């Protein structure tokens, strides 16, 4: 991707943002793979619940309620850093807003499905950032 940026914009060469952005993208993708593995059969691509779905609260989910969305934010923070312009920042802010709306909808569905168990889990863990206790 960096080669593409340099090819399309020959005067553009900022190694620190490129390196930092790629590191963030790799971390985000790796985080995403770990999260999907931890979810296993509980992975649902939409903000819905399934009849056999179980509440996952271990692994990365013991720290934050939505590590999958956190992985997306880390990945696209890397994209924004690589782009090194206002468009990348605006896109990232829009993504944050959209994900928060989606998370709220998903959490309402999880409260309906898991009730008090999910509400207790919400009290113990942060939405996207671990709670410090």
Regions found by a protein language model. Name each.
Residues 57-73:
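Membrane-interface loop-to-helix entry segments
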Residues 1-57, 77-133:
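Membrane-anchoring alpha-helices and their flanking helix-loop junctions
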